[in-house]
A protein has these predicted regions:
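Functional-site microenvironments in short loops/helix caps that host divalent-cation chemistry
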Residues: 2-6, 50, 54-257, 261, ...
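C-terminal, low-complexity/hydrophilic appendages and adjacent surface loops
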Residues: 8-12
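Short beta-strand segments
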Residues: 13-15, 238
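A short N-terminal beta-strand-loop micro-motif at the entrance of redox/enzyme domains
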Residues: 16-21
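Acidic-aromatic/histidine active-site loop/patch
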Residues: 30
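Short, structured beta-strand segments at or near domain termini in extracellular proteins/domains
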Residues: 270-284
Length: 297
C-alpha cells in the first residue's frame, strides 16, 4: 500500500498491508441507484437542504448571499491558465445530484455516478443498501488488483481523465468532457470499473498526509482528532481515492490506486462519488436488471 515516486509526502511510505475479506461494488453508485433510495425513503441530501448560517462561524452579514442558498461545488473552466483550484470551482446554488451543473443545466443521467453528496448522504444510502463505505486500505487493495504501481497517465481506453492542458484544453481522447457513465472503460483485474478516474471515491478514513508505517492490519487511518489536511487545516477531512476526470499530467497526477487527498465531508462536488463495500455477498445486479426482474414478477 502506498507509493513514493509521485507525491511521497501524501502517499508514502510503501508498506505491506493486510485487510480482511470483503466485497465491493463493481462500479460507482449511480444516479439511478441513488434515485431509487431517495424516492423510496423521501431522502433529501445536504446540497438540497436549507443552509445553516452558523456553520460559517461568521455573522450572517459577512456571508456571501449565494452561500446561504442550497447548492454545491461545480467545476467551471477558467478563461486563463491557472494553478489555483479556487479559479475553477464555483459554488452553484441549486446544484445537486439531480442537477449536477446547476438548475439551468441538464438533469442527472441514470447511469452516471451520483455526485454532490456529503458524507451523511453516503452513509444513509449505504445503510439502506446493506453496505458501508470502504476503508482506504480496502479501496486501494481492490483498485490495485495485484499490479505494480505506475506513475503515468492511463490511456483513453482504461480511464476517464483529462487529456490536454488542464484546466483550459481538454482533447477528450477518451470520448468524454466530464463524467462518464459507469462501465465505459476496461475493468481492472478484479473486474471493477472506474477505480481510476471518472470521479474521486470517498473512503471511511480521516485524512493526514502520508501513512502510519505501523498500520499494517486493517488500517483505519487517524482518529478524527488526529486528522489534518493542509488545504483545510481546521477541518477533519475524509480520504478520497483514484482521481477524477479532472486529473491531468500538468496538474493532478492522482490517477493511480495509491493516490489520495482529503475532502470536506459536508460539501459535495461535481467530481466526487463513492461505491460500497460489504462484509457478506450482496446483490450485484445492475439497477436495470433488478427493475426488469421486479416488473416480471
Amino acid at each position: 500500500m502506498g507509493q513514493e515516486d509521485v507525491y511521497p509526502s501524501e502517499e508514502g511510505p510503501v508498506r505491506e498491508t493486510y485487510v480482511n475479506a470483503f466485497w465491493i461494488d463493481p462500479h460507482e453508485v449511480t444516479n439511478r441507484q441513488f434515485a431509487n433510495f431517495a424516492d423510496s425513503t423521501s431522502y433529501v441530501t445536504l446540497a438540497e437542504r436549507p443552509v445553516d448560517p452558523s456553520m460559517f462561524g461568521l455573522s450572517e452579514k459577512q456571508i456571501p448571499p449565494e452561500l446561504l442558498l442550497p447548492g454545491s461545488a461545480v467545476f467551471t473552466p477558467p478563461d486563463r491558465p491557472s494553478q489555483r483550484y479556487t479559479d475553477w470551482w464555483t459554488y452553484v446554488p441549486g446544484a445537486s445530484w439531480k442537477k449536477p451543473y446547476g438548475p439551468n443545466g441538464p438533469n442527472a443521467q441514470d447511469e452516471q455516478p451520483v455526485v454532490h453528496l456529503g458524507w451523511e448522504d453516503m452513509v444513509a444510502y449505504a445503510r439502506s443498501a446493506g453496505g458501508r463505505i470502504p476503508t482506504e486500505a480496502e479501496w486501494e487493495y481492490a483498485a490495485g488488483a495485484g499490479a505494480e504501481p505506475v506513475s503515468g497517465q492511463p490511456d483513453g481506453k482504461s480511464a476517464n481523465t483529462w487529456q490536454g492542458f488542464f484546466p483550459l484544453v481538454n482533447d477528450e481522447i477518451d470520448g468524454f468532457q466530464g463524467v462518464a457513465p459507469v462501465g465505459c472503460f476496461r475493468p481492472n483485474a478484479n473486474g471493477l470499473y472506474d477505480m481510476i478516474g471518472n470521479v474521486w471515491e470517498v473512503t471511511q478514513d480521516y485524512y493526514r498526509p502520508g501513512h502510519d508505517p505501523a498500520g499494517r492490519e486493517n488500517p483505519r487511518g487517524p482518529s478524527e482528532n488526529a486528522a489534518y489536511d493542509p488545504y483545510n487545516p481546521g477541518l477533519p477531512t475524509r480520504v478520497v481515492k483514484g482521481g477524477s476526470y479532472l486529473c491531468a499530467p500538468n496538474y493532478c497526477q492522482r490517477y493511480r490506486p495509491a493516490s489520495r487527498q482529503g475532502r470536506d465531508p459536508g460539501l459535495g462536488a461535481s467530481n466526487v462519488g463513492f461505491r460500497l463495500a460489504y462484509d457478506s455477498l450482496p446483490d450485484f445486479r445492475s439497477p436495470r436488471e433488478a427493475s426488469t426482474e421486479s416488473s416480471d414478477d
